[in-house]
Design a protein with these regions (language model features):
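Structural signature of tandem-repeat unit edges
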Residues: 23-31, 48-56, 71-87, 91-103, ...
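Acidic Gly/Asp/Thr-rich repetitive segments characteristic of extracellular carbohydrate-active
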Residues: 27-46, 201-221
Length: 225
């Protein structure tokens, strides 16, 4: 039986002011390390949902971590991660480091500030490629709002210490592959759901009923986990 997870954002009318509007962008990166040069600072600041294709490296991950202040959803499922050697990657304090191809870099979305590891607080969902080999140390450590990690790969990539945030609610994996993940080292504590997540945003007014809004969206309350 295919299990689906429905993610619902409740936008109460009384609290609608001040919410960040969804801004979705897709970029093809032809040369690794050049993502940030493809947009203005204002564009980078406004993006909430970002899809990347082409070639990226640890420099691009550093920019994604440090220069996209409203980034919530990142899809790199069709991007190739290229090797990078240098000081402009994700490792804290500009340490010289070798970043291997198709590895999610160490400290990809976390950093050490005053001796404390802090994750990217805005990040809620990440979609990873079927080519991923490793998720490196502390890649998503401290990403307190990261709830969904979707991986296109049928065999579990190597998961290094503290690579994923404890806040993750579910790991979405391809159909028939949950056991492959469940029995791999360091993956044991996560919940796995096969297939694609189903997402919707519901606006419920002060007098509105949640069940009615769910039905209006074309879904059934029983589909919600």
């Amino acid at each position: 039986m295919k299990i689906k997870l429905l993610l619902i954002s409740f936008i109460l009318a009384a609290n609608a002011l001040g919410a960040v509007a969804q801004v979705s962008k897709t970029y093809f990166v032809s040369k690794p390390g050049t993502l940030i040069s493809m947009m203005t600072e204002d564009e980078a600041n406004s993006i909430t949902h970002l899809t990347l294709t082409g070639k990226i490296n640890a420099e691009d991950f550093r920019h994604l971590r440090d220069e996209f202040p409203n980034l919530k959803v990142l899809d790199i499922s069709n991007a190739d991660i290229k090797m990078y050697t240098g000081k402009a990657g994700t490792y804290p304090n500009g340490k010289l480091c070798v970043y291997m191809p198709n590895f999610i870099p160490t400290y990809a979305f976390s950093n050490i500030v005053d001796g404390v590891t802090k994750g990217k607080a805005t990040l809620e969902k990440i979609i990873l490629s079927e080519k991923i080999k490793n998720i490196e140390d502390a890649a998503f450590k401290g990403c307190e709002n990261l709830k969904i990690c979707q991986i296109r790969k049928k065999t579990a990539p190597n998961l290094l210490p503290e690579a994923l945030a404890d806040s993750i609610t579910a790991i979405f994996v391809p159909l028939g592959s949950s056991d492959e993940y469940r029995y791999k080292n360091r993956w044991e504590k996560f919940a796995f759901i096969e297939g694609e997540p189903v997402e919707t945003t519901l606006q419920v007014g002060a007098m509105g009923k949640l069940e009615e809004e769910i039905l209006k969206s074309g879904l059934q309350p029983r589909d919600i986990n």
